[in-house]
Structures are given as structure tokens and as C-alpha cells.
Regions:
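Recognition helices and adjacent regulatory flanks at domain boundaries
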Residues: 1, 9-14, 26-27, 35
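…primarily DNA-binding HTH/wHTH and HhH modules…
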Residues: 1-3, 47, 87-129
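Residue-level signal for functionally critical sites in structured catalytic/ligand-binding pockets
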Residues: 13, 59, 82, 87, ...
Length: 129
């Protein structure tokens, strides 16, 4: 399942600028949409929609820091209007998208990667017969 979760994160990254249905992610990794969303929320404490929105806004922030136009970035990351993008960006970052380049402020949401770390345990003696 760990590989499937990481495959899903790779799929999201590859399609951040595309219009895609979130159900396509679960199809891509061959897991039911319901179960994938439940597992994702249990591991991250955020919905899949929130994660995709945060990743898109994070990438948009990078573009704005490099001097890209707000209008271009809004449409590039799937927003239907500049007003909608501006509201979402301000709610997410606390500043207007038009202020990013001037203030040189960057808020980031990194790509998730799922790993298992095992610590502790009991040393077991074994004998091969």
C-alpha cells in the first residue's frame, strides 16, 4: 500500500497543472476512491482536495516569486477566475498574490512521501532446523 500511496503522490505532482478528477488518482493506483480518501485522511489529517489545492497554491507561489503574472498563474493552476485564485491564495498564505514578488514571501506545501520507520522491537533468538 505504501508504494500505491507514493504512486498517487507522483501522479498528483505530474498533473498539478491539469484539470483532473480526484477519482482518477484512485483509478491510477487501483484502489477504491472511498478507501484511498479514508487512508489519505487518516495518514495526513487533511482531505485529498485540501492537499491538491495546497500543492497547487505552493507551486503558484513559486511562479509568482519568479515574477509571473497573477492572471497567468491563476489559469495555469486551474482557477476559473483571477478573483477565485486571489481569494484562495490570500486565505492560504495571508497575502495577496500580487504582493508575493514585492515582499519576497514564500509559503510552501511540500510533496508528501510516505515511508515506514520501524524502531524498537524485541530481539528474537531463532534456530533453523
Amino acid at each position: 500500500m505504501l508504494k500505491k500511496l507514493n504512486d498517487a503522490m507522483d501522479y498528483i505532482e505530474a498533473h498539478l497543472e491539469d484539470e483532473f478528477l480526484l477519482e482518477k488518482i484512485s483509478e491510477h493506483i487501483n484502489v477504491s476512491d472511498y478507501h484511498f480518501r479514508k487512508i489519505f485522511f487518516a495518514l495526513t489529517n487533511m482531505t485529498l482536495n485540501e492537499y491538491v489545492k495546497n500543492r497547487r497554491l505552493s507551486e503558484a507561489n513559486k511562479e509568482l516569486l519568479q515574477g509571473a503574472q497573477v492572471t497567468d498563474v491563476a489559469y495555469q493552476y486551474g482557477y476559473q477566475s483571477v478573483d477565485g485564485f486571489t481569494r484562495a491564495f490570500k486565505k492560504w498564505s495571508g497575502i495577496l498574490p500580487s504582493q508575493v514578488a514585492k515582499l519576497k514571501q514564500c509559503k510552501s506545501c511540500q510533496k508528501l512521501q510516505f515511508v515506514v520507520t520501524m524502531k524498537g522491537g524485541t530481539l528474537m533468538e531463532y534456530k533453523i532446523v
